[in-house]
Curated annotation (Swiss-Prot):
Organism of derivation: Homo sapiens (Human)
SMART domains tied to this protein: SANT
Gene expressing this chain: MYBL1
Stretches the record annotates as Transcriptional activation domain: 230-295
Compartments where found: Nucleus
Descriptive protein name: Myb-related protein A
Function: Transcription factor that specifically recognizes the sequence 5'-YAAC[GT]G-3'. Acts as a master regulator of male meiosis by promoting expression of piRNAs: activates expression of both piRNA precursor RNAs and expression of protein-coding genes involved in piRNA metabolism. The piRNA metabolic process mediates the repression of transposable elements during meiosis by forming complexes composed of piRNAs and Piwi proteins and governs the methylation and subsequent repression of transposons, which is essential for the germline integrity. Transcriptional activator of SOX30.
Amino acid sequence: MAKRSRSEDEDDDLQYADHDYEVPQQKGLKKLWNRVKWTRDEDDKLKKLVEQHGTDDWTLIASHLQNRSDFQCQHRWQKVLNPELIKGPWTKEEDQRVIELVQKYGPKRWSLIAKHLKGRIGKQCRERWHNHLNPEVKKSSWTEEEDRIIYEAHKRLGNRWAEIAKLLPGRTDNSIKNHWNSTMRRKVEQEGYLQDGIKSERSSSKLQHKPCAAMDHMQTQNQFYIPVQIPGYQYVSPEGNCIEHVQPTSAFIQQPFIDEDPDKEKKIKELEMLLMSAENEVRRKRIPSQPGSFSSWSGSFLMDDNMSNTLNSLDEHTSEFYSMDENQPVSAQQNSPTKFLAVEANAVLSSLQTIPEFAETLELIESDPVAWSDVTSFDISDAAASPIKSTPVKLMRIQHNEGAMECQFNVSLVLEGKKNTCNGGNSEAVPLTSPNIAKFSTPPAILRKKRKMRVGHSPGSELRDGSLNDGGNMALKHTPLKTLPFSPSQFFNTCPGNEQLNIENPSFTSTPICGQKALITTPLHKETTPKDQKENVGFRTPTIRRSILGTTPRTPTPFKNALAAQEKKYGPLKIVSQPLAFLEEDIREVLKEETGTDLFLKEEDEPAYKSCKQENTASGKKVRKSLVLDNWEKEESGTQLLTEDISDMQSENRFTTSLLMIPLLEIHDNRCNLIPEKQDINSTNKTYTLTKKKPNPNTSKVVKLEKNLQSNCEWETVVYGKTEDQLIMTEQARRYLSTYTATSSTSRALIL
């Protein structure tokens, strides 16, 4: 977008300069103008005066209007009230005419261009060109990066849309204003648009100029300083996220601009410096401020070709490589993520060879690289063991040309040995088992921050990771973990017999509980932390003893739901009446469940009597539908009947374990009279099949058996079919079958 100068605005607004008046005279009259807005009455009066006096003498017209000058009257008429003015949309012919006139006169002489367009003023032509007809104007949809720039610029500049438009080439001030008022303001204020990304940038933009000074100071003090800004590459934050707004903004700033405006280039350079200073501030915050301690991050050199290093040279020159601010104290407990500096051999080798110690070391390593790669040849000094108990291990990886061995050097030991004025040149290197060596195809001098996975340390694991053992062995020791052939939950779910379980002392289960932290390879110990001091005691599920729960049976929820659905659909459930007749198998099953023994089986070794188990569970069975009568007549002759009184059997301590109910059959087919109920009951009580059993030594069961036998009389009446309605049905069945027995000798069952 071409810059609009102040002379252009004056040329547009002071169109009278093309007529009878001179600009210097009107500039002096500007002080006398009444800046009050024109009213409708003044507009109507001005129209009438122009119709009467014409547009030749504006001084005469201004004399009829109070507090209005001749220039104001002329400007109001020519710009607003003239009926010949066209205020509607632009036609294609007008747009084509504007394009031709701009190519002829340039994009600044709008009053001259407006004279060739009837009904259009210079302001209309200028806005039409800059907002629509200019080929450099972007008409594509707004991107998120453009929205972010508008949001940040609007916070600093407010509604100065012309200044904001300078930051967005291809976007006009009018389009930016319309985009903000129509879309962005609502999204920012109501929906929180762009709020998350801005919060992370505020901390880096507070100190805009101070990081630059610190950066210059760092560069002058340290000859090994590597510049931060590298075109085409980005940094990786400790959390794994890159500084997202740096890369697109940098690319945007580096793009060429069409307009060669010095002010615009100055603004762009200021923004670029602001961005770089913010980036440096973020980088400086990640670096610990205490030199030599390296308690917050681990440095790693990755070098190729003939590049090697030793701990002697690291002892003397590593602290010089990293220049840090000494004024800000850093706690030893801070553990920032690991930073890795990837350096190519050609970029650093030349500077390292100038140091005598490095040159001698390189010659020694090149002469025998295999010996220098041997891990066991390095020893650790005892002086470096004491001051670094809380310092984490810093790993230094060096890649040799021939051996292709990756070694890890304890940099922190070297630096701590230097602080104690000890010779820390000897340290131990731990070879890595992985043969893969990192290869970098990136340009030299790239500062990278790699992500390092950290696990919460226990007091035992702290010793493994960062501290030294008393014996002087510096190899990293880790407890070997091997897969178990069984599930640990088998032991967690079992409870020893001598341990008393309660709510205060719960048993260990396979479900992890906060506070019970135990490794698989170590024995379990009872925790001594009081219950009220646990971390999330309010959120733990209490251990409930099963003995506390009631012994009453509980109906399952699905069964309750099914019963409720049935009652809702079909009404309340009704008890089904007992059937009138039973088959022999069904009666045997019921008697077996009630008495506990099978009354039809003669077994000598079974107990005399079993206690009643439950109520009648067969009450909900189907109605029995058949009677077998004919077979009973044939079996009657082979059945041995022993008629003895029940009281006599109890005196002899003998119990009936096999009670066979033999129904009364008709001896004569023509017998039709009903048998009295009393006679049937008496005959039934006298008809039993007796089997001798061993006497039961438990006398308490004898009393219980007597009560059961007395209480079962009524029940036996129902079971044996001796109620009134059952006898009626049985007699009717006999009458019905008597007709078949006379004509046919084959027996058949009656299906009711």
